[in-house]
C-alpha cells in the first residue's frame, strides 16, 4: 500500500529538517519500495506491506489524548 508513515504518537513522520534520503530510508525500513518527503512536511511511501500503519484523516490521532 501507499501512504504517509506514522509514528507511535499517530503523527506523520516529519521530514522538514531531515536530509533528502531520510524518507526513502524510513520507507525501506518498513519494506516499502520507495518514498519521498512530500512538500517538505511528511514522508510518503510506496508499495509497503499492508501491516504498516499509515496516516488516515478518518483515524487521525496526532496531538490527541488517548
From Swiss-Prot:
SMART domains, sorted: Knot1
InterPro entries reported for this sequence: LCN-type_CS_alpha_beta_dom, Scorpion_toxin-like, Scorpion_toxin-like_sf, Scorpion_toxinL, Scorpion_toxinL/defensin
Subcellular localization(s) per the UniProt record: Secreted
SUPFAM superfamilies: Scorpion toxin-like (SSF57095)
A GO MF term: toxin activity
Pfam families: Toxin_3
Keywords, comma-separated and alphabetical: Amidation, Disulfide bond, Ion channel impairing toxin, Neurotoxin, Secreted, Toxin, Voltage-gated sodium channel impairing toxin
Domain description: Has the structural arrangement of an alpha-helix connected to antiparallel beta-sheets by disulfide bonds (CS-alpha/beta).
Protein name, as recorded: Toxin Tppa2
